[in-house]
């Protein structure tokens, strides 16, 4: 009764409804049968368009915490971190328990919010949550108990406590057991109906018309009896059907029928007497004495009074009544007391009339017929209950089997997906293994080819060493004393350059200005480079290769012709405030460098690869004629390897960073196209005058836009022709491709393109020349006083026409210029000057 008062007070407190919520609340207790409640809610409300659910779970608040010794300690006596950890453990356990229910919502692809409510009063907590959120649909499970149970009917308490704007659905074993409609659905009426699958009974069968008056009389008698409490309704066992309707006046009425020999008979005689007097007439001992009787005594007394009423036809007061206390055991005094009050109401009968005997006879007849109908109804009900139980079990089994089938299908899909991934991984592994196998075979083949080439190179090296000491090497031999005197004992003011392999000094040997390179002493590698450079420069001649005047092999000194304008790198970077090189001269320099590379690559008997081409190794004479120098890092390859194959070098890559072929850096394999890569970088520096670092990327980004492209060009070189300069830049980018096979051929593609650009530069240069100029002074022979036809260098260091100097030497042993004795009469052809003279003559024509 106390709980009922609390529920009623809470219901009145929560009577004002909040804004309605589109959610459906499902309250569970976490037991096995809770899944039927969730399943019913999903099947019911998802087709109606509800996609937002709230899962309510009420648990008692934490007031004590158990210890490992089994002692419960109050929360107030423990630290906050211990209490917090214990609560987190409880939250984790609750979430793990609710996980299967959340999966049921997730499989149906609907939103679910899990709410953990801490309260000692589940009905009050759920009602407060419904009132706060405005949920209009609540689904709960039925609280089942036996006839003699005193357990609280929690479903009834919840249905009573929940605000009136919410409809409550009570579920039992997956089926709807009862509904408490909201005020908007049923105008304030609340109706509980127990289905046959849960309570074992159905609604009373419809009686024939002749029994309607009888039932009306029974209802009138019951209206004077105080209604049962919800606890009494649910304690009446599986053979009771309780129906509660709330009328407009708010009065509760209950109709109860039983099939255990209990009968309700109301006489139709008009006139009423006091119920206490009626009960005293039927039981003179009094109400208190009757309530104190045992179950057996009450039943026997009930039978005696029934026989007395049947046999006494002259009695003024005949009432057939079933005593409610005879049904309930003596242990449940509160049920007996309530039943006695109902009996008191039923014993209030009307005044005795003259046709009392006939009415009693009719009542007995109706009682017999009603008993027969009830027996038939009980039999049908028993069969219905059995069938309903079987159907429920079958439905439950079908539901479990369907869940297992869904799980098996999910496992099957996961297994198929895993198998597919494993198969794909296996195929990829097999393909990778095949690739590795092919790479290993290619690597073995390359290794054998490299070993073969290494042996061949060793033989070629031996031949080269033998040829270095052969008499075929032609160069002027200088002593160490002569070189020291020519450089003023290597004075610092005469030093014009220094590198990784030696220093370069300006010298004057035999009245000839030259440049002597002195290699660092004591290094075997430098000795090899000296011998290689001496051999190459002493045997080959080209207008765009630096001319070797002589050497001192004992001290590692090489004497070159002196280049007045220094290196291309110094002129591009304007070192010492030197004037910039015009753009048309740069076009010509690119062609000259390319022609020198073609000459080296096509030399006989073996091609030569420079390997260290950069602006610092491109020297300029007083007419800006370019010549390649520093061939000490050059290497020779076999003639068969020039066009299609490369040579494998076992040493680490040599050269200057940013100019080295990327494939040569990565593999150590050198080829003529390694020089092509360096040439491409030099071309890009000619047009931009910028360092080699990232120059390829910079030109690639700007070449597509005229404004950006003009911005990266060297503006100090003059007015660049945009289309021709872009063509030269594109050629430089092609030369700097990462893969050798993507680079153009030097002779067949690069040289023709540069020759066409040189013609454009020559036309521009001729337009800038106002008056035709005469031959340069160094073209004039000191003997002939005219342009030389075949220039050559004599022992005094001056250049003469060959015919004129030979005629002079046949007659005299002195120099035509200095008039000093000549140390020898050897003549060295000056091919560089010869090429310049021929070019000047062709341009003049």
From Swiss-Prot:
Polar residues bias (residue ranges): 236-251
Q: Which UniProt keywords apply?
A: ATP-binding, Coiled coil, Kinase, Nucleotide-binding, Serine/threonine-protein kinase, Transferase, Ubl conjugation pathway
Q: Where is the composition biased (Low complexity)?
A: 187-204
**Listed pathway(s):** Protein modification; protein ubiquitination
Residues that span the membrane, as ranges: none
List the coiled-coil residues: 351-468
Which positions bind ATP? 496-504, 517
Instruction: Identify the residues that the record assigns to the U-box domain, covering every copy.
Output: 774-845
Active-site residue list: 612
Q: Which family does it belong to?
A: Belongs to the protein kinase superfamily. Ser/Thr protein kinase family.
What protein am I looking at?
A: U-box domain-containing protein 52
Instruction: State the species of origin.
Output: Arabidopsis thaliana
Gene coding for it = PUB52
């Amino acid at each position: 009764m106390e709980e009922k008062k609390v529920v009623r007070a809470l219901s009145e407190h929560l009577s004002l409804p909040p804004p309605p919520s589109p959610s459906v609340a499902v309250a569970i207790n976490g037991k096995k049968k809770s899944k039927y409640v969730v399943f019913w809610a999903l099947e019911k409300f998802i087709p109606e368009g509800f996609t937002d659910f709230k899962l309510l779970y009420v648990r008692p608040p934490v007031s004590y915490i158990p210890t490992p010794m089994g002692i419960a300690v109050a929360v107030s006596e423990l630290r906050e971190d211990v209490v917090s950890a214990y609560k987190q453990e409880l939250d984790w356990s609750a979430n793990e328990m609710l996980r299967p229910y959340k999966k049921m919502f997730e499989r149906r692809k609907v939103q679910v919010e899990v709410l953990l409510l801490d309260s000692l009063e589940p009905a009050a907590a759920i009602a407060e949550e419904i009132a706060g959120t405005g949920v209009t649909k609540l689904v709960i499970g039925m609280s089942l108990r036996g006839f003699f149970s005193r357990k609280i009917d929690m479903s009834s308490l919840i249905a009573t406590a929940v605000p009136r704007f919410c409809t409550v659905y009570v579920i039992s074993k997956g089926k709807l057991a009862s509904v408490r409609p909201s005020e908007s659905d049923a105008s304030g009426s609340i109706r509980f109906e127990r289905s046959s699958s849960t309570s074992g009974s159905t609604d009373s069968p419809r009686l024939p018309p002749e029994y309607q008056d009888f039932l009306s009389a029974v209802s009138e008698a019951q209206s004077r009896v105080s209604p049962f409490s919800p606890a009494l309704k649910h304690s009446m066992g599986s053979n009771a059907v309780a129906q509660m309707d709330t009328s407009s006046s708010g009065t509760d009425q209950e109709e109860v029928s039983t099939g255990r020999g209990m009968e309700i008979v109301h006489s139709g005689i008009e006139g009423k007497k006091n119920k206490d007097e009626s009960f005293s007439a039927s039981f003179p001992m009094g109400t208190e004495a009757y309530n104190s009787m045992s179950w057996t005594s009450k039943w026997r007394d009930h039978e005696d009074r029934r026989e007395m009423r049947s046999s006494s036809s002259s009695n003024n007061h005949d009432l057939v009544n079933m005593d409610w206390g005879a049904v309930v055991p003596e242990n449940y005094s509160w049920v007996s007391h309530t039943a006695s009050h109902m009996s008191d109401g039923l014993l209030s009968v009307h005044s005795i009339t003259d046709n009392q005997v006939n009415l009693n006879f009719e009542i007995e007849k109706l009682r017999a017929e009603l008993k027969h109908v009830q027996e038939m109804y009980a039999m049908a009900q028993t069969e219905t209950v059995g069938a309903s139980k079987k159907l429920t079990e079958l439905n439950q089994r079908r539901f479990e089997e369907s869940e297992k089938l869904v799980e098996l299908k999910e496992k099957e899909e996961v297994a198929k997906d895993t198998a597919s991934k494993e198969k794909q991984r296996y195929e990829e592994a097999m393909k990778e293994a095949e690739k590795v196998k092919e790479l290993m075979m290619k690597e073995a083949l390359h290794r054998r080819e490299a070993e073969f080439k290494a042996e061949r190179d060793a033989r070629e090296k031996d031949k080269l060493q033998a040829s270095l000491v052969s008499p075929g090497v032609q160069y002027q031999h200088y002593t160490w004393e002569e070189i020291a005197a020519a450089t003023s004992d290597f004075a610092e003011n005469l030093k014009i350059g220094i590198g990784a392999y030696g220093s370069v000094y300006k010298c004057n040997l035999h009245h000839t200005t030259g440049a002597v390179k002195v290699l660092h002493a004591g290094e075997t590698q430098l000795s090899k480079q000296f011998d290689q450079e001496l051999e190459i420069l002493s045997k080959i001649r080209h207008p765009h290769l630096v001319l070797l005047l002589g050497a001192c092999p004992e001290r590692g000194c090489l004497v070159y012709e002196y280049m007045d304008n220094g290196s291309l790198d110094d002129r591009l970077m304007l070192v010492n405030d030197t004037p910039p090189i015009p753009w048309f001269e740069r076009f010509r320099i690119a062609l000259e460098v390319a022609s020198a590379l073609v000459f080296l690559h096509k030399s006989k008997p073996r091609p030569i690869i420079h390997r260290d081409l950069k602006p610092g190794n491109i020297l300029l004479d007083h007419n800006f004629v370019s010549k390649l120098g520093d061939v000490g890092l050059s290497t020779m390859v076999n003639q068969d390897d020039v066009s299609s194959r490369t040579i494998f070098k076992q040493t680490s890559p040599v050269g200057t960073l940013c100019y080295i072929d990327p494939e040569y850096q990565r593999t150590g394999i050198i080829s003529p196209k390694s020089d092509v890569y360096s040439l491409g970088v030099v071309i890009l520096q000619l047009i931009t005058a910028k360092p080699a670092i990232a120059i390829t990327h910079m030109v690639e980004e700007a070449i597509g836009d005229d404004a950006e492209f003009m911005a990266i060009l060297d503006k100090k070189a003059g007015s660049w022709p945009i289309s021709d300069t872009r063509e030269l830049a594109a050629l430089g980018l092609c030369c700097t491709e990462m893969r050798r096979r993507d680079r153009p051929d030097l002779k067949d593609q690069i040289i023709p393109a540069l020759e066409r650009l040189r013609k454009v530069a020559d036309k521009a240069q001729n337009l800038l020349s106002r008056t035709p100029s005469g031959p340069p002074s160094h073209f004039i022979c000191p003997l002939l006083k005219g342009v030389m036809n075949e220039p050559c260098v004599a022992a005094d260091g001056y250049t003469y026409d060959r015919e004129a100097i030979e005629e002079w030497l046949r007659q005299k042993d002195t120099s035509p210029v200095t008039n000093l004795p000549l140390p020898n009469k050897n003549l060295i052809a000056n091919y560089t000057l010869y090429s310049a003279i021929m070019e000047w003559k062709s341009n003049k024509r």
